[in-house]
Amino acid sequence: MVETNKNLPAWRKAIAAAAREVHKGEPIDEPLITRLDFYLPKPKKPRWLVPATALDIDKLERAVNDGLQDGGLIKNDSRVVQSISEKHYAEERTGCQVTVFRHGATAVHIDFQPR
């Protein structure tokens, strides 16, 4: 699949690097739930209170899930059985907060800001 947003591959690589930093063990190989909060640049005059604009949330989710797999946090992105995602305007830094929950158990948290 070809990415239509030129920044998503860089996000994916950065998320993979962040995943490697926080998770040193074997990839998680069980059903997972993700909580993804995307913090996007706020325009000078936003049309809406939230960023209902260009970056599609499903493409952002895919980039994160692929990055989590590439970074060895999860065995396969097909293990994500539920995802709760929101786009917000960034007050300070842009990026993504990622929390991965084992279905019915504990969580792994990643606070990712692109450099």
Locate predicted features.
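Acidic, proline/glycine-enriched N-terminal capping motif
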Residues: 1-115
